[in-house]
């Protein structure tokens, strides 16, 4: 009976990992080249976080039966994906102004 519960626990963890992977689909091809590049970069960052989280879920030990449920819940709440901030939408004027090029020699 113990091996049956172990198999069920493994199936539950694998379903959870599968659900995590489904929540991060590969980005679509719309937008400019730079926008597509940024989308892929952010997707790759989220993917790395999901892989790390899935590894932690898979290797997370079962709580012992004598451990209080609150402690087990607290340990599970520590498993979280960090939010990745979006890049700024507008570029500062100092970077956009071609007349102020610091590399050009002053005549």
Swiss-Prot record:
Gene Ontology CC, one term: host cell nucleolus
Region (Disordered): 21-41, 83-107
Subcellular location: Host nucleus, Host nucleolus; Host cytoplasm
Chain location of the short sequence motif Nuclear localization signal and RNA-binding (RRE) per the record: 32-48
Region Homomultimerization: start-end pairs: 16-24
Protein name per the record: Protein Rev
Quaternary structure and partners: Homomultimer; when bound to the RRE. Multimeric assembly is essential for activity.
Organism field: Simian immunodeficiency virus (isolate Mm142-83) (SIV-mac)
UniProt GO MF annotations: DNA-binding transcription factor activity; RNA binding
Keyword list, A-Z: Host cytoplasm, Host nucleus, mRNA transport, RNA-binding, Transport
Family matches, as InterPro entries: REV_protein (IPR000625)
UniProt biased composition (Polar residues): 21-34
UniProt motif (Nuclear export signal) ranges: 69-81
Known role: Escorts unspliced or incompletely spliced viral pre-mRNAs (late transcripts) out of the nucleus of infected cells. These pre-mRNAs carry a recognition sequence called Rev responsive element (RRE) located in the env gene, that is not present in fully spliced viral mRNAs (early transcripts). This function is essential since most viral proteins are translated from unspliced or partially spliced pre-mRNAs which cannot exit the nucleus by the pathway used by fully processed cellular mRNAs.
A single GO BP: mRNA transport
Lineage, opening ranks: Viruses, Riboviria, Pararnavirae, Artverviricota, Revtraviricetes
Swiss-Prot/TrEMBL domain comment: The RNA-binding motif binds to the RRE, a stem-and-loop structure present in incompletely spliced viral pre-mRNAs. This region also contains the NLS which mediates nuclear localization. These overlapping functions prevent Rev bound to RRE from undesirable return to the nucleus. When Rev binds the RRE, the NLS becomes masked while the NES remains accessible.
Entries under Pfam families matching the protein: REV
